[in-house]
Amino acid sequence: MEYLRIAFLFALTALAEIVGCYLPWLVLRQAKSAWLLMPAALSLALFAWLLTLHPTAAGRTYAAYGGMYIAVALAWLRVVDGATLTRWDIGGAAIALAGMAVIALQPQPT
């Protein structure tokens, strides 16, 4: 069960970061309302707070988080941007998630 909690927390953290970066991108690249910067800032603050909830050292958290970020970013690419994922996208995400699992699920010293 702990593994699922860690994976969910990584996915939620990645989503908060992606939303926090995507909204300013809409403002700057697609001339959307500057009001989108407010929820973007809140989302990035949520992202920073969520990072503090991870149960391991910050550097290890960031390293493991990167794998989940890749997978969530590709899901965003498919769902929000409507792009078709390639086998290279899927294979790369699988490799990144395997790396995340090695780092995040390593035995903890007693």
UniProtKB/Swiss-Prot annotation:
Belongs to the UPF0060 family. One of its GO terms (cellular component) is plasma membrane. The chain crosses the membrane at residues 8-28, 33-53, 63-83, 90-110. It comes from the Bacteria. Pfam families: UPF0060. It is found in: Cell inner membrane. It is a multi-pass membrane protein. It comes from Ralstonia nicotianae (strain ATCC BAA-1114 / GMI1000). This is UPF0060 membrane protein RSp1275. Keywords: Cell inner membrane, Cell membrane, Membrane, Plasmid, Transmembrane, Transmembrane helix.
